[in-house]
């Protein structure tokens, strides 16, 4: 017989969750390290009442995404694939060409890959805003600056 009987899943009502807005400056920071810090905040793992099945995380604004850094030779060797869903429609881009065309895409792809797949992951991804430079449209929010490694 199980001696521990008080194990109950925590359910927190959304009206009791206070969502904050965090700003991360990505200039001269490594791509993966910024992405993991953002995912921790988006999922709510920094809060004491974290549960993996609820959206308890905060909103994240990432600025200067075009100034992000990669280690090694990934700048020219890392390849991103996409498909048009037509036969023979596989396209590939290197980090360099993708970041020239859409500077926020590599960071968004990295963060989306770290989030859970399914409806909760899509809901969490909507709490992320990425900007290529330091200008953003969310200055009216009460912003907290987050220092990432």
Curated annotation (Swiss-Prot):
GO terms for cellular component: cytosolic large ribosomal subunit. GO terms for molecular function: mRNA binding; structural constituent of ribosome. Gene3D superfamilies: Ribosomal protein L13. GO terms for biological process: negative regulation of translation; translation. The keyword Transcription does not apply. It holds the Pfam family Ribosomal_L13. Keywords: Ribonucleoprotein, Ribosomal protein. PROSITE patterns: RIBOSOMAL_L13. Part of the 50S ribosomal subunit. This protein is one of the early assembly proteins of the 50S ribosomal subunit, although it is not seen to bind rRNA by itself. It is important during the early stages of 50S assembly. Belongs to the universal ribosomal protein uL13 family. This is Large ribosomal subunit protein uL13. The gene is rplM.
